[in-house]
Amino acid sequence: MTPQAFYLVLEQAGFALTNHQKEQFDTYFKLLVDWNRKINLTAITEENEVYLKHFYDSVAPLLQGYIPNEPLRLLDIGAGAGFPSIPMKIMFPKLDVTIIDSLNKRIHFLQLLAKELGLEGVHFYHGRAEDFGQDKQFRGQFDLVTARAVARMQILSELTIPFLKIKGKLIALKAQAADQELEEAKKALQLLFAKVLDHQPYQLPNGDGRYITLVEKKKETPNKYPRKAGIPNKKPL
């Protein structure tokens, strides 16, 4: 997917980008490739692939109508090189974006990226989701939590739901096996007082299959969740 094809698909979906936004995506691509030589950010570095499998894939929830262009607080867990939240922020500048990532080198990249792109209302924190999920500054503070290819839903739900306000939503982007994951996660979602609202398959423009799963928080998360760092992974709910 060339940059021009990316812009055209967005325009056809009703999201025409300004020249400034196009420049931001171009700068993002160049910085991603440059920094990837120093630290491992992505296995995908060819321009057309980045625009398809990183940029388009990241903004798919916007194109599907799951996120409005409003000043909502969005948390991205394990964003790596900034996906999906930074492409979302470029398209919807009103979003207030927070990223938590466990690798400090990636946080340094994201700080530089935000500065080069001229982004405001972006915040980066180094650490584990399990620790931040028990911090009053973060727990129950977000309208939206996004996660792309972070963990199976059974684990992911414990890492993300505690951050949401009541009626806040988790938007999980999955490449495959999403139906099976949801079946496995039934108990976890019950324990966390969360409910699946939507679970939609869609395709990238090249035909690759993807899923978006939308989960709503119904009540306050019990205090014992999330458990200590590493436990959700070793002993899923």
Swiss-Prot record:
List the GO molecular function terms. rRNA (guanine-N7-)-methyltransferase activity
**EC id:** 2.1.1.-
Q: Which InterPro entries match?
A: rRNA_ssu_MeTfrase_G, SAM-dependent_MTases_sf
Q: Which UniProt keywords apply?
A: Cytoplasm, Methyltransferase, rRNA processing, S-adenosyl-L-methionine, Transferase
Q: Where does S-adenosyl-L-methionine bind?
A: G78, F83, A129, E130, R148
Identify the GO cellular component terms for this protein.
cytosol
Supply the enzyme class, top level. Answer: transferase
Q: Does the keyword Ribosomal protein apply?
A: no
Q: Which cysteines are joined by disulfide bonds?
A: none
Compartment(s) where it occurs, according to its Swiss-Prot or TrEMBL record: Cytoplasm
Describe its function.
Answer: Specifically methylates the N7 position of a guanine in 16S rRNA.
Record-linked PANTHER family: S-ADENOSYL-L-METHIONINE-DEPENDENT METHYLTRANSFERASES SUPERFAMILY PROTEIN
Concerning its family, UniProt says: Belongs to the methyltransferase superfamily. RNA methyltransferase RsmG family.
**Protein name according to UniProt:** Ribosomal RNA small subunit methyltransferase G
